Amino acid sequence: MSLSSIDRLRRWRRAMLGCVMLLGAAGWLAAPAMADAPPAADQQTVRTWCAGCHTEDTPGQFQRLSAVRKSPEGWQMTIFRMQHVHNLALPDDARDAIVKFLSDTQGLAPSESAAGRFALERRPNMPDLKLGDDLPDMCGRCHSLARVSLQRRDADTWLRLVHMHVGQFPSLEYQASARDRYWWDIATKQLPAKLGAMFPFDTQAWRGWMNRPHADLGGEWLVHGHSPGKGDFVGTLSVKATGGDNYTAHYSLQSPEGKPIGEIDSLVRVYTGYEWRGSSKVGSVDTHEVLALSEDGRRLTGRWFEAAHTEVGGDVVAERAEGPAAVFMVSPRALKIGTTSEVLIAGRGLNGTVTFGNGTSVKVLKASPTLIRASVKVNDKAAPGPRAVTVGRTSAADMAAVYDKVDRLDVQPAYGIARVGGGHIDPVTAQFEAFGFIESQAGQAPVALGPMNVSWKVEPYNADAVKAQDVKFAGRIQPDGSFVPGPGGPNPERVFGTNNAGDLTVVAGLDQEGKELRGQAHLIVTVQRWNTPPIY
Amino acid sequence: MRPLIACALALSLFGSQNLSARPALRDYILTGAKPDHLFVIDAAARKVTSDIRVPDANGIVGLVVPSPDGKRAYVLVNRMESISGIDLDTGKQVFRANLSSGDEVVHSFFSVNITPDGRELIVHELPTKRGLNEYHVQEPRFAIFKTDAGLDAKPVRVFPAPRRVHLVLPKADGKSFYALGFQLFEYDLATGKKLGERGIRNWGRPGYSTPDMLAFWPVTEPLDVFVTPVYSTLGTGKDAIAKTSLMKLDLKSGALSYQDFEDTSAVIFSAVASPRNGEVFTVYTQLSKIDTNKGVLVDRVNLPHTFYTINIASDGHEVFVGGTMCDVAFYDPDTLKQRANLKLPGCPDQSISTLRVIRR
């Protein structure tokens, strides 16, 4: 038996024991929409609902509660535990108000949440934070280390968190990657000091941030973004303050070709002065936006996603509409030598002659200060490489790239996970994208061409996957690179009646003058997660 | 309707043998299932003779520990916080120990067993103090209960215990017991004094990695021998070979041994030692037969689905597999062919429950 198949067996065994052991774990409800009622809270609200157990030792200092700082979702998860494990009967509006108040007064500075933002943004298939040798197994095997990084507390309070884990989940020490070591000793004697030094309660960053007045986000914004599998988008965002860091927002979005995508209304609450949480509907689909305001208050960046399928979403950037001229995005980015293509330039204060550099000629088809549609012809003699795009006196480096041949396809994510559905749980899809590159001369970075139009297929990852016919059972990849897993539960057609899990290679193919360029990624199709907490 | 039937069945259970002049002992299989079932199965008749509903089981009947005389079964219920003792003749709860009390929540991770005289239960406890706004995990301990303590049993002796114990096995002489965890520990039953500790983590097999074991089915019948698979790698780097070995603990002599029988080629959850010819049978998605005299895998067959637990007829003439789903299957130990498959009434999930065999 090959080593890889032994790994496979181990993984199964580990997964099995994992499920077996977590029987006692509390389930999660879906994240509540956080932006529908404008709350107002102060210390008195915390006193009313929390001080019964979290004794107020000195005015405003509540035991345990005052010794931690976290993200809004972190507060939401903790309070969920207070309700469902400690039987706190808390009305929704009081809960929302307390989450807001504690996020503002015991939150994270932008620099503190930066590393773990991908978890707040629910980005699928992200490699976890690298936090040393022992933490991945000790703390990063049930949830992400991003969850750990999104908290600030001192050593003694990290220790109390370890007690909560083992007290609440007594099987923890018996599980794979815990029973192979003196888990309790390491977790109680070594890690608290280490975590306390890495993520301490009192920081310069937070002191600086917490006393800054919150920026008013009201006004007009210019939006651009990219949704994997769907493509780029541009548009506008109008934001109106409704009081208490709540806003209504209206997005008006279109594709680069000018096709309307949607007129979207969102209810927004801003936590900690920069954490934008929006809830909206695109068509009939509930969606959220998790964005962060830059420290200068002029730019929002983050991700939108479907509420019920957080893996489906895209990158969003919004820039203040007022401001100096700038080019934000050119779509598409890659321009092939010897061809003419239509491109969209999105920016602010755009005015003047458009150029894409040597060997190109540009014809503007339609122009406004924020959007220019142009036809760009690339001569046979043009040199491959990155291009600055200039509009009048505004220039932005590396906005486009000229290429003759794609040298490499880089499929992202390189390692993806999809999950079969089952019961009331929907399958989790996996979206792949193929990024093109030109390999450059030695010492120079490869030239990025952006997402390419490719054909998709899946192949067995290894001999075991061939034998188990994973390609047949595990699911289908769509033309847009989205993998949709097969149905959940035992499949009587499979050996041992096993479920539709699989081990697959995802292959992107690009036809270049009759020759196929391949790029590939690894896809694991596995069983459902029974709970999807707000911070994975 | 269901409880009435269960009671009726419970009353008739074992009835037949009282009628015969020289009762031949029969094998009965015990298994638990969600949410509160304790089934008694007449092995030869392939029949469920009793479907007992354990009071306040709260989810799952996990560990099953029969008394040595086969009259009672002690089951771990209430999410590992309570032990319920059931009279198998009446189906009534005759013993109950709720391990948690006051501000202390106590779990036992499958580490409950009974002394050979049937008088005491040995329980490895994991206590946590729940304060107003914090948990305080306490040091684990062994608690000894009298089996005649009734429905509000409290421990009669308590001793300090190591962490991460997953199995308690009494020695056949009744004077000491083993606890399986990081090491194989032995304790004096009366005083709680640690009598010894043998390597599991550092098992002293040159060239082998630290072994991985997770056994929480204390099946030692019919030989008073406990066997379980142990996983390790032999060698390092490119030449490393994954090894499955059998750990064997003889509860009569106290002898502990490890035997290799294959480079890892299947997942095995549990094992049982047969009274015939030094054979050991193991199970997961496959049923395997190992000859421990020669240290070789003799035969292996695919099962229709995964079974977590295995046991064997007292005379070794039949192998039983169960756990996971809602059936118990009977296999020929020579051919590994299925002889029968018994679906539990209502098809409740046995999940991680233990398959035990009593003789009545």
Residue ranges and their predicted role:
Chain A
Residues 143, 208-211, 215-296, 301-304, ...:
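Central antiparallel beta-sheet cores of small beta-barrel/beta-sandwich binding domains
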Residues 336-393, 450-453, 459-467, 471-474, ...:
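Immunoglobulin-like IPT/TIG beta-sandwich domains and homologous Ig-like subdomains
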Residues 320-353, 394-446:
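Beta-strand/beta-sandwich contexts
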Residues 31-46, 86-87, 94, 109-133, ...:
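Electrostatic cytochrome c docking/interface patches
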Residues 57-85, 132, 144-169, 263:
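Gly/Gly-Pro-rich "capping" loops immediately C-terminal to redox-active cysteine motifs
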Residues 204, 211, 216, 288, ...:
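Edge beta-strand at a domain terminus
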Residues 47-58, 98, 135-147:
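The canonical Cys-X-X-Cys-His
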Residues 87-117, 170-210:
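C-terminal capping alpha-helices of c-type cytochrome domains
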